[in-house]
Structures are given as structure tokens and as C-alpha cells.
Amino acid sequence: MTATKHQRRSGNPAKPPQPRYQPGVWHRNHQFAIFGIVGATALTLFAGFLGPSAVTLTLGPRHSYLPPWYLPANVVKPNEWFVSIVIWVAIVLGALGLWAGLRAMADGWRPKYKKIFVLGTVLSLLTSLVPPMTSADVLMYAAYGRLQAIGRDPYEITAAEVFRSQFDPVLRWTERPWQDTPSVYGPITSWTQLVANKLGGENMHDIVFWLQVFSVVPFILACAGAVMLAHGDPRRQGRAALLTIANPLLIWAVVAGAHNEPLAVMFAVAGLLFMRKNPFVAGLGIGLAGCAKVSIGLWGLAMLWAYRREPKKALLLCLGTAVPMGLAYVLWQPTAFFQALRNGGYVSVGSWANPIYTFLNLFMTEYHAKVVLGVISYIGLIVIAWMLSRVVPWTAAPGLAKDADLKRDPLTIALRTALVLSVAWLITSMYTLSWYDLLAWIPLAVLAANKLDKIMVIRGAALSLAYVPGRAIDMGPALDFTATRIRDTVSPIIQIGMILAVILWWRQPDRPELFPFKKAKALPTTTAPKVTAPQAPASKPPPRSSPSKAARAQEPVPVSELASRRKS
């Protein structure tokens, strides 16, 4: 049980005392949650500020005072083990802090969403002031923008084709393994990459700064939209702020890596804000999101499903979606859409699919192994989505009238369906990474707490740990062995465990634990305890009298006694 302490509001003694949350154990302690969130970001900033290392990207020469900031190269040379351990500790600390925060909220903690949102915003902005870490994707964003700046098509030509034939001050700083891969991003994302190159010139360091801006600003706006979706319910708004902008797993995976997922999610959240008001504008939002990244189409399907009983609104949603999608993929960049679908053919090392892919490669070609995995993945997506649709609780999105049917509210349906489809896709996809989780965290944050909270924390922490250092660079054999085992063994086992957790949830929806490690308490075989009312003072019972002979003669005689009488 959690103890609560009552305090009166200062300045107005007439008002009743305000309950203040007092945790009983550390894993329900909101103060530990805040410590874990802030501590994780502080460790991330520390590792980034040390400068280029096995974890932190090398951005080339600096010719301006623009961020990202870090120590000069001749000050310190970070040890690869030291910075890797710092980031591993940061991820674990952040995950524990988030876990404690969720348990504290379930136990009665009511965080003020404005304070949590400001905290998360500050942490995100600070994280964007140091170099990106572990993932070299941002260098490829810069490369695709550079190709456009010099008049080449990033959907047709690769960065390696250029820098292998001629010197280029930007492309030379890219890293494997994506140097030979054309762009797979939508036209709007490609446009931001071009703008970053225009603003940063021919300096990779400055270009990366602007790409960080195009990551952190949409991230903050998308999280603000999630809090707005929870308007009218301070408790739900506090949850939304904690699981989005102040989520240490997202700050690490999305902001520290300067990934472009927030750009698509920002437009999609804007579309959700209009689900109850204007389906055409909602369609414009999800259409713009699809122009940034095609994978956000899962939310589009969820929004269309929400209007399935209202054909006119469904048509308006489709028309709104078609306007930006048609302009972007038909007129602006016709080849972009097909290139964007290429991610479906990859297998990420940290996913559930990697061990199976390795096994299939023993007796079939890589192509056929991927085909088999693809079939399994799509079947799994359908099955897991169906299972989740049966067990994810129906909770109304804030703002719904009390007398309204939540199962006919388009916003509630869209959020719940987006959550179901996103989680099903994330845990069954052959190619899955921790920064993709933003697609699921946003709708999950707006809806009420459920088992997916735990699943997403465990999944995100495991994938984040798996990609530290996470770069295709030379490192010591000991670190390489350790990081590889986390990536190709530990993480896939945990990802398979998350699929199993969903299946067990579907089979036993009333069990509070993810896994049946704890034996269910057996029901008592004895009768229920009697509830007695307060008894009156005991009085002396009347004297007991024996029944008369006539009464005893009328009492029924047992059969055995009757038989003995007959024998005698």
C-alpha cells in the first residue's frame, strides 16, 4: 500500500487538503523516475561532449560556432569501452526510470504535465547540442541532401558512386553500410535534407546541426500534439508527457540519433487532432506524413478504419490524403515511393528474424530466405494485430462526451487501431529499430495504461542496447564480440519474448504479469468467511429441557437402528 500525506494549499486555508504522493518502495518512486530520466540524458550528454569515439560520430572539421559542441580532438581520446559502458548504463537507467514512473502513476502519482513537458523539452534540446551517437543514418541524410545540392537524384544514384570517383567535402564523411544505398525516404524528408545542405554549406558538421534541428523540433511538436490529444484530462496529459517528450528511450533513440521519424509523426498527429472535426483536414495531415515516410501509412489505415461506418467522411479522408501524396509521389518524385518500400526487404540483426534468417541460409539462398521470412512476417503481423485487437482495452480518448459511445468515436478508434497496428508491425517486422517505436509510443501515451507499456519499455531498451556502438567501424575484438552478442543473440531472444508476451496476454487476458512466472493463487476451498453484525450483550440462556417421551417417539429412527430392531 502507498502512504499519502495531506497538505493544505498555501494561501487558501479554506480549501481541503491536497493529497501528495508518498511512495513506499523505490520502483514506485516518482523521484527515482525523474532521477533516471535526467540521469540517462546527463550520461548521454557526457559521452557526446567527449567528442568522436566508438559511440559518437565523426563530423569532420568545424568552421563555425554552431552546435553540435564537443571537446577538441587533442584534449581527450575517449576509450571505446568507457563510452560504450556509459551509454549502456544510460539506457538501463532511463528504462528503469521510465518503468518506475509508470508504476508510480499506477500507484497514484499525478505528475503535472506542464512540468514534465518542460523537463522533456529541455532534455531533448540539450541532447541535440552534442554530436549524434551510435547510428550513422544522419550522415546519409546529409549525403542525400548533398546529392540534390550538386544536381543528382538520391533515388537513382548512391553516395559511394560519387565519392569513389571524385573528392567531395561532405560525402567523404559518410559511413558504411548505407553508402551504396539510394534514398528510401519520402519527398518531404528529402527536401529537409536539401535545406540542411543549403544552410550548412559544404561542411558536414554544420549540415548535421540543421538535420538535428529538423529532428528535435518535429519531435517536440509531435509530443505536444499528443498532450493536446489528451486535453481535458490532466492525468492522461501527464501520462502523455511522460511517455513521449520525457521518455528517455525516445530521447536516446530518436533525438540522440537525429532520426527523421518525428517529421512524419508530427504531420500524422496533426491529422489526428482533426478526426472529430474535419476528415478532409485529417487526410491532409496523414498524407503529408506519408510524404515524409511511407511506414506512417499504418496510421492512415487506422484513421480510415475509424470512418468505416461513415462512407462520406471516409471519402473525404481519402481525398485529403491523395492531395499531398499525389503531388509528391506522382509529380514531384515519381521514383520515391518504390524506393521507400525497399526497407521491407532488409533483416535487422537485433530483430526476432535474424536467428531464423541465419538458419535458413544454411540450406537456401539469401533471396529465398528473405522470401520465407517475409511470408512469416506478414502472417505474424495479421495474427498479432488480431490478438491485440482482442485484448487492448477500450478507453475513450479525452474530450469525448460522457453519453457518447466510445466504440463509435473516430478519434478513439483511430488511436486504438494505430496502436494495435504499430505494435504488431514493430514486433513482427524483419527490419525493426528502436527509433521506429515512436509510431507506437504516441497513441499508447494518449490511451490508458495497459500491458503494452511494459512490452514497449522492454523492447525499446533491448534494441537500444543492441546498437551500442552500432556503427560499422573498426573496434577492439573484445568490444566487438560483446556488442555483437548483445545484438545478434540477446536482443533477438528478447524480441521473440515480446511476441510470446502478446500471445500469452491473448490467452490469459486477466493475468497481470507478462509471463506466468508467478503461480496464480489457488482459490480457498473453505467456505467464505461469515460477516457478522455487532452482537448484543450476552444474556443467560434459558434452562434446557429434555423433550417429552411422546416427542421422542415421533422422531425419525435411522435405518440401521430400525434393521437391528427387526433382527432382534
Question: Where do the protein language model's features map onto the residues?
Answer:
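Transmembrane alpha-helices of multi-pass, membrane-embedded glycan-processing enzymes
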Residues: T189, Q193-G200, L211-G225, A264-F267, ...
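Short hydrophobic alpha-helices at membrane interfaces in multi-pass membrane enzymes
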Residues: V269-A292, L316-L317, T417-V420
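Transmembrane helical bundles and short interhelical boundary loops of multi-pass, membrane-embedded
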Residues: T2-K5, N12-Q22, R28-A90, M325-L400, ...
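Intramembrane catalytic core of multi-pass membrane enzymes that act on lipidic substrates
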Residues: W109-Q212
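Perimembrane helix-loop-helix junctions
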Residues: L298-A322
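Transmembrane-helix motifs of polytopic, lipid-linked glycan transferases
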Residues: L93-R103, F209-R236, I382-R390
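Specific aromatic-rich, kink-prone transmembrane helix
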Residues: G225, L263-P279, W386-S389, S422
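Membrane-embedded helix bundles of polyisoprenyl
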Residues: G120, V216-V217, L229, Q237-M275, ...
